[in-house]
Amino acid sequence: NRYLGLRRDEQGRFLLRVEPGVVLSELRKQLSKKVLPTAGWDQASLKAYDEFQEAPEQFFPTDPTEASACLGGMAACNASGARSYAYGPIRPHITGLHVALADGDLLELQRGEAFAQGRHLSLVTAAGRTLELDLPGYTMPKTKNASGYFVADDMDAIDLFIGACGTLGVVTELEIALQAAPAVVWGVSCFFD
């Protein structure tokens, strides 16, 4: 449940590395206060943290109903919530994963670095072993869907593991993209007789 580091990408977004046990409600509190636990961070992360403290307030847009959810569990089920119509589920907000495979080997996945060729995916593990995977041929529906593995032609490899419920490997580290918090949040309730 540790916070492992912070960096900025080429788009200026803050990318936060965390262990899977970080609780969403605690993350929200720390982001709103602009205070993150930085023990053990390297110099590059501390520099990004200084920039984070000077930047407009940041937030993590995924909002499942259960605020006590851990980020690892949210990644495992591709969590979404009331804000998903505006921000989508957690999948597009995860930029990196470390995954422990059943045989003990590790995968380090970064969004935008490894893609399937059609429905074939080649992944190189931390031990240097190449995994050759043939992805299922079904077509994902264009509606909200949480059944089966996410697959698409030429897909980003990271997306196969998000929403796989831990069946392909255990997430040991996540990198999530933060966004500038909206200036105003509105809620509307309607009552009808």
Which residues are covered by each model-predicted region?
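FAD-binding subdomain of flavoenzyme oxidoreductases
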Residues: 4-6, 25, 29-33, 37-193
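Short basic, glycine-rich beta-strand/loop surfaces that mediate nucleic-acid
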Residues: 1
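Extended, alpha-helix-rich binding/interface surfaces that flank or overlap catalytic cores
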Residues: 21
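Structural motif
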Residues: 12-13
